[in-house]
Amino acid sequence: MKALAKLERGPGLTLTRVKRPEVGHNDVLIKIRRTAICGTDIHIWKWDDWAQKTIPVPMHVGHEYVGEIVEMGQEVRGFAIGDRVSGEGHITCGFCRNCRAGRRHLCRNTVGVGVNREGAFAEYLAIPAFNAFKIPPEISDDLASIFDPFGNATHTALSFNLVGEDVLITGAGPIGIMAVAIAKHVGARNVVITDINDYRLELARKMGATRAVNVARESLRDVMADLHMTEGFDVGLEMSGVPSAFTSLLEAMNHGGKVALLGIPPAQTAIDWNQVIFKGLEIKGIYGREMFETWYKMVAMLQSGLDLSPIITHRFAADDYEQGFAAMLSGESGKVILDWTV
């Protein structure tokens, strides 16, 4: 089958031919329709320090996808040939304390699809049936293919009650931008997002941001004054991994505020702990998606009117993957979709 793989320990990916995956007793085989390019895939493309330490070579990658079940293992129940599915990209052990307690997103033995094992940038993907998630017919293939990052945004944004709250999001990548739409959808009052990328900030405005702030030119304090905010933000969502962004977020938080961290900062990042202690801030680290509560919430929000369509800005045939990666690398894109049916 056709697949997009890391064949050598260096930058780039190669469209190649690999063996179609075997289907275990508890697996489903998915014929891929669409995939989306993730920030993780950009790290793999660039072959940065993280990728060099993490990605086995050779291996085909990718973990954001939608497709159709074409084969099932003999032990699989609850699915049928022809079901349209996306899937949870974190394959968990099922035996550790967190797995047995229903907190599988905190499994200490997680294996990542397209990171630690063969991925979805291919014509077929085999995964445990437990990880597959049926997609309702009213949700498009394009939207279903981005359920993985949509899930990151959902898990982060819905970690705290947002109804009537003022929310600050630092980092206008696709996940941060989707968090804007989620926060507005569930009833936040002001949703402010910060970045230095004007293209992405404009996308955030289209997705409903009260203010999209280029902090290279505009003061967050001035924006808060314009919005008649006198006590700071109630909820902060750190999506960038940039230390200066986290610092500004802590400074802008109200006393008793709540902060969710999804962005991954450099190791040993220093912060002003006085901001945390004397403001009584609650800080929560976010990893992946809650299995499968996050997935049900994603579907429910889309079915109740959440519009994520502006975040998908580019579409290419899988054979034109280099154009897709170029769009992502340019910084002037939202989500980029690769079509495996053409």
From Swiss-Prot:
It comes from the Bacteria. GO terms for molecular function: L-threonine 3-dehydrogenase activity; zinc ion binding. Zn(2+) 2 binds at C93, C96, C99, C107. Pathway: Amino-acid degradation; L-threonine degradation via oxydo-reductase pathway; glycine from L-threonine: step 1/2. Binds 2 Zn(2+) ions per subunit. NAD(+) binds at I175, D195, R200, L262, G263, I264, I286, Y287. It catalyses: L-threonine + NAD(+) = (2S)-2-amino-3-oxobutanoate + NADH + H(+). It is an enzyme of class 1 (oxidoreductase). Its cofactor is Zn(2+). Keywords: Cytoplasm, Metal-binding, NAD, Oxidoreductase, Zinc. The active site is at T40, H43. It is found in: Cytoplasm. One of its GO terms (biological process) is L-threonine catabolic process to glycine. Its main location: cytoplasm. Pfam families: ADH_N, ADH_zinc_N. One of its GO terms (cellular component) is cytoplasm. SMART domains: PKS_ER (SM00829). Zn(2+) 1 binds at C38, H63, E64. PROSITE patterns: ADH_ZINC. This is L-threonine 3-dehydrogenase. The gene is tdh.
